[in-house]
């Protein structure tokens, strides 16, 4: 994002949606560096929202929960776990009792970047199936 906002054409607004993690809000044992980095993304989002609003720039963040991606599938496969086992292991990691799909993470990003969210800036949207309130 460095330098991108200031170079925006004056007649066009820009929208940034940063991807953090629900663990930026909760933290976990043994994951301090990852969780702190994701919390830093939230601080950066709020700061940039303040700094860039005069340029017509909106900056928001989403905090996804566990998302069943190819990355997690390949890590599970390398550990000898089936997809069913992976899904079972994460059933308790959200109120909804399952992993998110990549599409369930993409839609809120698209919405925050759309004109329908034109009055939202500096916000954090938890897309975590309720994990952040557990």
Predicted features and spans:
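Active-site loop immediately N-terminal to the catalytic Tyr-X3-Lys motif
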Residues: 26-32, 54-55, 97, 115
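Residue(s) in the substrate-gating loop at a strand-loop-helix junction
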Residues: 21
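A conserved structural motif in NAD(P)-dependent oxidoreductases
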Residues: 94-105
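A glycine/serine/threonine-rich, flexible loop-to-helix segment
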Residues: 54, 66-93
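Short C-terminal tail/terminal secondary-structure segment
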Residues: 26, 98, 109-110, 121-134
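Alpha-helical segment proximal to the catalytic Tyr-Lys
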Residues: 6, 50-54, 118
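Active-site loop-to-helix junction immediately N-terminal to the catalytic Tyr of the SDR YXXXK motif
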Residues: 27-35, 47, 75
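Active-site helix of classical SDR
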Residues: 1, 37, 45
């Amino acid at each position: 994002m460095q330098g991108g906002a200031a170079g925006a054409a004056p007649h066009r607004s820009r929208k940034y949606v940063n991807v953090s993690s629900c663990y930026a809000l909760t933290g976990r044992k043994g994951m301090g560096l990852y969780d702190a980095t994701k919390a830093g993304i939230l601080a950066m989002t709020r700061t940039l929202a303040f700094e860039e609003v005069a340029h017509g720039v909106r900056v928001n963040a989403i905090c996804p929960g566990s998302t069943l991606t190819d990355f997690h599938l390949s890590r599970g496969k390398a550990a000898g776990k089936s997809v069913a086992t992976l899904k079972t292991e994460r059933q308790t990691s959200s109120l909804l009792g399952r992993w998110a799909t990549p599409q369930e993470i993409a839609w809120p990003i698209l919405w925050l970047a759309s004109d329908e969210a034109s009055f939202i800036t500096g916000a954090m949207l938890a897309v975590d199936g309720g994990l952040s309130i557990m």
